[in-house]
C-alpha cells in the first residue's frame, strides 16, 4: 500500500494481503527429475543444474525443488495455478515463491512459517537479486503489516474497516525493469532520492496513526500522495 520501491532502500512500508491466491501442488516421483508446469510454461530438468544457466521464470520453483530433494533418491512434479494477474504489481512472483516453498517442503515433514519465508526469499533472489522480502513476508503471514528490510514485520492489529478496489489495466510491467530504473535514478540523483525517502518515511508514519484512528478518507488522500512520490 505504501513504500513500494523505497522499501528496497530500508524505508518502512505498509503491506496488505489481497484475496487472490496461488495454488501449488507438489508430488514425489520415482524418476529423479524435476518437472514444473504452469500457465506460463513448463520446465523439466535433472537435479543439480546451475541456476544461473536456467533461463525461465519458473527457476525459483526449480531452486526450491532441487534443494528439497538433494538428499533424496526421487524427483518432484509441481503444478502451479494462480489467480493473481502477472506483471500487475500485485506480488505474483513472491506469492508463487511462498506457495512453492510451502507445498514442496511440506512433502518432507513439518515446516514453520519462518522457514517458508526464508526459503521463499532465497527462491525469489534467483530472479530478483535485490528483493526486499516485503512481498514474500505479507504473502506468508497475510493481513495488514508494517515492514522494513532491517527489522522485519509487525502486524497492524487495528485494521481499519474499509475495502480496497484494485483496477487492473492489463498492461504488464517488469518488476526487474522498474527496480533498475529506480536504482538508476537513485545513483544519479542522491540528494533528491534522499529527500523523497524522508518524505515517504514521514508519510508512512502518518498513515500508521490514521489507521489506528480509522480515518478512511485521510488514508485515501495519503495513497494519492504516495503515488506522487513514486
Regions found by a protein language model. Give the residues of each.
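Short, histidine-centered active-site or binding-site loop motifs used for metal coordination
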Residues: 5, 40, 82-84
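C-terminal nucleotide
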Residues: 7, 15, 23-66, 106-110, ...
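Short, conserved micro-motifs enriched in small and acidic residues
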Residues: 55, 90-98, 131, 194
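DPxDG-like acidic metal-binding loop motif
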Residues: 20, 90-113
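A generic structural signal for short beta-strands and their flanking turns/coil linkers
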Residues: 20-22, 74
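Glycine- and acidic-rich phosphate- and metal-coordinating loops
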Residues: 63-87, 119-122
